[in-house]
Amino acid sequence: MKILKSLVLLVLFMAMPAKADDAFSWMSTSFGGLKSLFGCLEVPEFTSFKEGNIGISLSTAGTWQSTGNSVEKGKLLKINWSTSGITPEPRKYLVLYRIDPRFSTPQVFIKTYNYSKLQFEALGFPRFVTDNNSATPGAIPPDKDLDALSFTKMSDSVKYFNYSNGNSRIEVKAGDVVNISLVGKDNFFSPNTLDNILTQELDSSIFAASALYTQSNLGNFDNRIIYSSAKEVCDLIDASRDPDKPSGCSGTGSATKYKSINSNEALVGKPMITRAVQNFMGLINSCPANAGINTSPACYYDQGRGMIIKVGGQVIKERDQSFVNSGSTQSSFIYYQATSGGTMDFTSDWQVNNMFSNSVLMSDWSRNFSNYANFVDYINKNDWSANFLYFGRYSMIVEIGNGANSINPGDQQNISLEYLITSDGTLPDPSVRGTPVDYNFAADAPQDGYLWLRVVNPNSNIQGVVSVNYANYTGTTWFSDIIYNGAIKPITDQFRTFSQNFYIKLVKNSAVQNIAKAALTLYVTIFGLMFVAGALKLTAVEVITRICKIAIVAFLIREESWSFFNTYFFSAFTNGIDFFVTNVVGATSSRANIFGFIDPIFDKYTNGRIWGLLFIELLQIHNGLAFIAIITIYSLITYFRAILEVIIGYVIAFIGLTVMISLAPFFIILMLFEKTKSLFDNWISTLLSYVVQPTILLIFFLLIDQVLSEQLLKVVVRACWDTLIPIKIGLDLTNLGIPINFSFTLPFLPGIPFYVPDVPEISSSNILTNKANTFLVLFTTALLFYSYCLMSYGLVTFVNIVVGMLTNVTPARISGNYQERSDPVGAVMQDIGSVTKPIKKAAMAPARVFKDKIIDQNYKARKPEGGEHTNKFLAERNDVPKKEEGERKE
């Protein structure tokens, strides 16, 4: 004994220096590497649909846009799009504001942008024919032939600036945002103008008092206004009034006059020749604030000063107010949001009256002169010296928009969306036509390939982005294909044919026809006798009702009876079931398969990751997760059975519907008489109940399914690679009298590695929040999941009661058993259970053995009567009485 003790101690002393961290570190590292290799199994997300969205700008209309999404033939493709992000394009105008002494108000030339033609239009501008033989009659500038100038031209010009010749003002609506920017003259005289109107300056080297001009003769200095007395101007260019200096200045003080030295061009807003105006503009500076006509020295107004802008009579820019200068864009602008609507006016309170001593208004000339020669003499003989100078111009671009404004219905209807599926990812040519889709489009993909979308927009006056949401089913369809295409559709098609054939044979039967004719004859006879006897008080409604009844029964015995009633009456019931089922279901795998909604459900509850995590939980016997997994699996089996009940309920409802339709001739005849009309009403109620029952059943079922999906994700937890069963080696020598008792784990194999559920312990931080999947949360969630599955299992009975209350049609009662209502679906499920009972028992036998021998560790059976061990390893079950056991053997 002493020798044995000594050997044991020697082994222990020799083993002590060999620590796991030192000698077996590579083994420990290898085990940790497995953990990082396998990682964790996350709870899957139920994504049977691949969804996406894309915004397609109207600026890219006609060009195919890639979604980056691939679709599969025969599977659902849904496209929803909206035009809520589309607004009208801002209304754009080019405006030339010019001072001309011949008009009492400033000249305003307006060009409107036409988005359809992508050009500006000078609406209502007076076009003068210059040469009938010209290829472009009406070309601008006007002709230089003075003999062709007439008072008609002057009248048209006056009408144009008074907006009475087709020239419309700029309209502004309440809420519109108005942006006015100063631009160069080249922007206004853009070649991008319809019919080349106002594409270049209206100017002529030959003076014509009746012609229109646009040039302000400021040379390179534009967007400026001169408003100064002749004295201040002459004090700059000819202060001494030197008669030898051809300045055009005469007189002193308030009697100072200025006259253009070459011609009378001051009449048309051109008081100086180009060289003179260049010198003059170089001498003056920008006017100070609150400057006026007598400000000394002479100055010019810029940044929009000197011009008043009104909207609906409300001033939005004062005369002395400057445009805002943007340093980043080097532009001057004014920004305004209209509080009320109206027309936009460009005007000024500086008057041109009294600039000359004689009348210079074109409106007066057209009234006072009837002879062109007299008008020419008037212009040539009078002295056109100016008392003050008021000339210049502003070129502006006006943009008006309103993001709150919606496009008009016509423009909205013209916008369409097309989709295209290609076999490869190559950009399709714009000439390739696609399939138009409505706002809520759902159909099965015609082929495999990549999805492309494009907007077709014939309207160029709107802007924005069309928002498109798309989704396509990516899961499997095997279950619905088997259930619907393999089982249900053949049954429904067969019963449709049966119903039609039976109905036609019934209508053609001579006995039925004689009954119908006799009923009609009797109905008309009784109606006539009662009417003659005065027993009826006929109203228009009653007369129409009786006529309709007679017409319906008379049409019933005709050859085209089936075609008529099936088209206008029976189809409302036979197609009504499919219509309601299809429209109630949100997620489905195929539009052509009314049971496609089952595919996403089976994709969720047959997900391999879900069942893998449940299997991992089954292995957690020591902490109770196995019990939760068993509850979940049993609940899923119960739910699958409920799905089968829904399918059987649909089939039974359709069969009952077709049978009722095949008997329609009998019930339609019964509607003639009040005593038999109740049978006809009950027949209609029965038809309606067969339509309503599967619809309501499906609605309840889908609502429960939404809750079940959320609960299932809470029952299943993620699992990470870890030690499933720890391995500890213990050594207890106390029985040998040696005071040694310890245990240790192998450093290279601390336990059997496998996936272990990641379940946190219950703590004060998570017990109240229920956010962490603790054991308590998992257990309560599993019970809820089980309750919902039981709820779905009892839906058929509940829906039968609801439909009976709605349609007043109750199922027949079984004799005995407290007169319980019959349940065809329950009977079918009971028969299925009887057939599958042997399979169920065979599947449960291994589970029972596992429970007895592994979990309960009942290796040695006890005597049923005494409770003592029989000493028989793996003996018979002791919970089976001998009597039952003997009967079972027999």
From Swiss-Prot:
Organism: Rickettsia felis (strain ATCC VR-1525 / URRWXCal2)
Key word Glycoprotein present: no
Source taxonomy: Bacteria, Pseudomonadati, Pseudomonadota, Alphaproteobacteria, Rickettsiales
Pfam family, one: TrbL
Protein name: Uncharacterized protein RF_0092
Family, as annotated: Belongs to the TrbL/VirB6 family.
One Gene Ontology term, aspect cellular component: plasma membrane
Position of the signal peptide: 1-20
Compartments where found: Cell membrane
Stretches the record annotates as Disordered: 860-890
GO BP field: protein secretion by the type IV secretion system
Bias kind Basic and acidic residues: ranges: 862-890
Transmembrane segments: 518-538, 567-587, 613-633, 651-671, 684-704, 775-795
Keyword Transmembrane helix belongs to the record: yes
InterPro entries for the chain: Conjugal_tfr_TrbL/VirB6
Keyword vocabulary terms for this entry: Cell membrane, Membrane, Signal, Transmembrane, Transmembrane helix
